[in-house]
Each structure stands twice: as C-alpha cells, then as structure tokens.
Amino acid sequence: MSAKDIEHRQVIVIGAGPAGSAAAQRLAEEGIDVLVLERRSIVGNPAQCGECIPHWGEVIGTFKHLEDHAWLKEYFDFPERLILHRLDNMRVFLPSGKSYHFELDAFAGHRLQFDGFLADKAERAGAEIRMSTSLKRLQQQRKANRELLVTSEGRFTCDYLIDASGSLAHVGRLRHGQDKDVRPEDQVPTIYAQVKGDVPETFDVFLGSVAPSGYAWIIPKGPEFANVGLGVRAGKLEGDLKGHLERFCADLNLEIISFGGGWIPMGG
C-alpha cells in the first residue's frame, strides 16, 4: 500500500442527498476543502421519500430557534421550477374517522430535480462531488492515528468525516457493526407509488389499519397526480408492503405508474 495512492481531504461527506449537499455547501462557503462521495450515478435517483418539501415558514414554525440563522434560510429559497404543487393544507385522519386540519407552508416537488439543485449549489460554492463512488470499508491506520476510507474508486483519508448516507447510516454500520448503542434497529420500511387519478388538493395522512404502527399518505403533485405511500413497523403488517399499497390505491381508484421506497428511522 503506497501513500501516493491515498488522497487526503479536509472533510469527506458520504452521500449527496439534501443533508450531504447542504453540509458540503456550508463548509465550502467557509473556504473548507470538502469532497462528497455519492454511490449512485445520478443524484437523487431513485427518490426515497414522499416529496413534500417545507418552505422556510414551515421550518421556523416547527423549530422556532432556527429563525435567526440567516444562512440556513437561504437553503429554503427554492426556484419555481422545483414546485409542482403548493401544499397549503394538511389533513390527518384517525382510526375513529375523526380528522384534523392544519395549515401548511410546503410544496410537492420532484426529488430528482430537488436533489440535483442542492448538489449544484454545493459545487458552485466550491465543493467537489464524485458520483458512482461507494464506501466499501473503513480501516484504522494505527501509526497515523486516522481512518482509511476504501471506496470503489480509490482510497481516502480526511480530517473530518460526515455520514450523510441516510437512515441506514452506512458509515456507522461499517464502523460499529450491529452495536445497538450506535445503530438503532427500529427502522420502518416505506413504499410509495406515483399515481394518476382523482387526487385531493390537500396533503392527507392516515393512521390506523391502513398502516399498522405507522402511517399512510397522499401528497398531491398536480391536478391528476400524487405520491401515495405508507410506512409500517416490521412485523405489524400481514402480507407484503407492496400488496398493501396496491390495495390502498385500488380502494381510492388510483392508477399506479411506478413504485419507490426507503426507510424511516425510529428512536434515533
């Protein structure tokens, strides 16, 4: 192993999703050398969420202590081309049939374009993003007292490492294995479908038997299209997740165009 084959950077970020790109942009704006490693060939593809994105007003309405962070506010200045449908209202339906209505300051967006937009901002700020580069393992260099990152496209060291790989915490798993103290096991699998049909104007959430120990959602993306999905804790659902979603969409007379999915961490 030659030291010449190892590339050193100040900060390496694993994952070019919204968190990774935002962190990279902020660091680059401060003049810090930052490299983002993304395992996929296209940022944001495939999408792994319901595609509801909050505006700044919704963020500070929920997290009031963030209001004075002007630099953070800039991250929520989105161009109109990312906004497919404005979400001004939300409804939550309980198993009893009772519902609650809330005002909302958000929009339905296209995650592929949204993630690409954030990655472009990070690169314009001076960050470097390398695609199709997956982290394979971490090796401790005892003499140098640092970790060696072994990837599909080379080896790296860094002063600081940021794990922005998503809810399954790829870096944490490589470093700590199945240690429950650093990797909670309670991960909720989710599945969604892009659908066509008579969809509501509001962002609707359903609790109860439709998604045991979880929730289902309908996020309208325009007059006839929506992102419909559900997340259920493992072991709480009879049958497979995809079949359950198909029945949910059939009950709503919605035509399924495509499927996607992801994970939601519970408890940490």
Predicted regions and their residues:
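Hydrophobic anchor at the start of a short beta-strand
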Residues: 11, 32-34, 161, 203
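Glycine-rich FAD pyrophosphate-binding loop
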Residues: 16, 28-49
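N-terminal FAD cofactor-binding segment of flavoenzymes
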Residues: 40-90
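Conserved Rossmann-like nucleotide-cofactor binding loop
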Residues: 19, 42, 168
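Flavin (FAD/FMN) cofactor-binding core of flavoprotein oxidoreductases
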Residues: 255-268
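Beta1/beta-strand and adjacent pyrophosphate-binding region of the FAD-binding site
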Residues: 3-19, 35
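Short beta-strand to alpha-helix junction loop
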Residues: 101-121, 170, 233-241
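Predominantly flavin-linked oxidoreductase catalytic cores and closely associated redox partners
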Residues: 16, 123-255
